[in-house]
Amino acid sequence: MTQLDLIRNFSIVAHIDHGKSTLADRLIQLTGTVAERDMKAQILDSMEIERERGITIKANTVRIEYPAKDGKTYVLNLIDTPGHVDFAYEVSRSMRAVEGSLLVVDASQGVEAQTLANVYQALDAGHEIVPVLNKIDLPAAEPDRVRTQIEDVIGLDASDAVLISAKSGLGIPDVLEAIVTRLPPPKGNREAPLKAMLVDSWYDAYLGVVVMIRVMDGVIRKGDRVKMMQTGAVYGIDRLAVLKPQMVDIAELGPGEIGVLTASIKQVRDTRVGDTITHEKKGCEAPLPGFKPAQPVVFCGLFPVDANDFEGLREAIEKLALNDASFTYEMETSAALGFGFRCGFLGLLHLEVVRDRLEREYDLDLITTAPSVVYQIYMRDGTVQELHNPTDMPDLTLVDHIEEPRIRATIMVPDEYLGDVLKLCQDRRGIQLDLSYAGSRAMVVYDLPLNEVVFDFYDRLKSVTKGYASFDYQITGYREDFLVKMSILVNDEPVDALSMMVHRDRADLRGRAMVEKLKELIPRHMFKIPIQAAIGGRVIARETISAMRKDVTAKCYGGDATRKRKLLDKQKAGKKKMRQFGKVEIPQQAFINALKMDS
């Protein structure tokens, strides 16, 4: 059991690539928490995809013991949080589990959009924040400019920011001293009833579900019977441990301490991030504030390229869902793509990560249908429906109005690209809320429909700014707009996988782009194929793939025109019949490319 004044709990806040995981590696290395031979880069990022993309997806923790200059040995608990907006709720829970943050900013790049979003979360959680300027050994580093930027944009005093290079290890001892001297110790009462926050949980093949907790009040011991306050489920604790980053067993955890427990829990869904854990008997009265279940925001269909892989996909998705409570799925059938799943995600990065993990860890080839968001449909009879899939759109005569989710987007961009960014946001039905400057960078705040962002907004933003813009968003709520369902018909047959919800003003443009793209992708057949984009019964765009034609008059010599006419009429009648009964083969690649549309 550690004294409260010798504990420091902290997280590291940074934009992607500003050196957060490298700094964590150095802190672990310098304090000898992990033996040199076991040390590897990004030691806290356990998933292969986290290493490869250089991002942190799950919150990870490590307990470091540090003998400080004042002669005392402190216990430092670092929670390494995800920096990406899709995992914002995980970040907010992790922030509530600690008392302070290190704000890591790249001395050559300055403050970025995600830095801002995460700093505001840290400030909301009441954190003490220590600014750290990383990569000061780079030729392009400008510590003084970045210091003023931190003061102007965030409003933090950065005069005593710690200067480091996480890569070479320069300045790391100063960071450890700053954690001990400038961050506050946790508060808590040993004698009070147990109150612990569930920070994260993951599935382990041998142990079942492993739950990471932060004890606020009271003491938790091995063998205790504990209750989850949101679900009401009761479990007996099999094992208590701290992570160094490997599990090290411990007898009890007291106030201010962070550790993990296992209790024969079968599914991650039974453990909800942000829930309060207390004793079954003589537990605490009220749970910790701020709990909310994760809500999927973006939906799309996942189908196997080879129909025989469906069972493999089902198993893979079930295993992934064990480890990811925010990922939802249900079975779906599509006339064009066969059997698959309709899956819900927290955002686009979450979608990409899940798809990459399915393809890589389970060796599957997948087709992803166009991502869609959740619409609220207000019916004439006063009921409200949630629409996850455009193909389930009810008859328009029964619909009063449709509301779509809106977001507040913050974009940081060098001012020479500002015009292009403003144009992109206006094209996507954005409403400008704010524009401010910090040095040579502009910060734009826009209100945008999420539907316009999930498609390819991020890619377009990166291309118009040569990769210099950074982007972050929060969902603000729902608003009514003039939305319609656009169907694509090939040879007069609707193709369900290609239908989408669009704004009426952009439908013509979107429809024309889609039919032109399909015209290039679908191979020619022996008969003429019309491709149409339609809203209800009205066709808004059409292209025709001409038929392949055999020269039936080649064997006619001489000048008898009636003979040629007869042969041509016979061919024409055959083509007509063929079109009536013929099926159009749409290759899988055509679906994949059509869904990668850039409009």
From Swiss-Prot:
Kindly give the membrane topology term recorded for this protein: Peripheral membrane protein
Q: Which UniProt keywords are present, listed alphabetically?
A: Cell inner membrane, Cell membrane, GTP-binding, Hydrolase, Membrane, Nucleotide-binding, Protein biosynthesis
Q: Which Gene3D superfamilies match?
A: 3.30.70.240, Elongation factor 4, C-terminal domain, Elongation Factor G (Translational Gtpase), domain 3, P-loop containing nucleotide triphosphate hydrolases, Translation factors
Q: Indicate where this protein resides in the cell.
A: Cell inner membrane
Q: Which residues bind GTP?
A: 17-22, 134-137
- InterPro entries from the xrefs? EF-4, EFG_III/V, EFG_V-like, EFTu-like_2, G_TR_CS, LepA_C_sf, LepA_CTD, LepA_IV
Q: Which SUPFAM superfamilies is this protein grouped with?
A: EF-G C-terminal domain-like, P-loop containing nucleoside triphosphate hydrolases
Q: Name one Pfam family in it.
A: LepA_C
Name the SMART domains on file: EFG_C (SM00838)
Give an example GO molecular function: translation elongation factor activity
**According to the lineage, what is the superkingdom?**
Bacteria
Q: Which residues form the tr-type G domain?
A: 5-187
Q: Does the keyword Membrane apply?
A: yes
Database matches in CDD domains: EF4_II, EF4_III, LepA, lepA_C
Q: Name one GO biological process term.
A: positive regulation of translation
Where does the protein principally reside?
membrane
Provide the Gene Ontology terms for cellular component.
plasma membrane
Reactions catalysed:
GTP + H2O = GDP + phosphate + H(+)
EC number(s) reported in the record: 3.6.5.n1
Q: What does this protein do?
A: Required for accurate and efficient protein synthesis under certain stress conditions. May act as a fidelity factor of the translation reaction, by catalyzing a one-codon backward translocation of tRNAs on improperly translocated ribosomes. Back-translocation proceeds from a post-translocation (POST) complex to a pre-translocation (PRE) complex, thus giving elongation factor G a second chance to translocate the tRNAs correctly. Binds to ribosomes in a GTP-dependent manner.
- What's this protein's family per the entry? Belongs to the TRAFAC class translation factor GTPase superfamily. Classic translation factor GTPase family. LepA subfamily.
What protein does this entry describe? Elongation factor 4
Q: Which organism is it from?
A: Cereibacter sphaeroides (strain ATCC 17025 / ATH 2.4.3) (Rhodobacter sphaeroides)
Q: What gene is it encoded by?
A: lepA
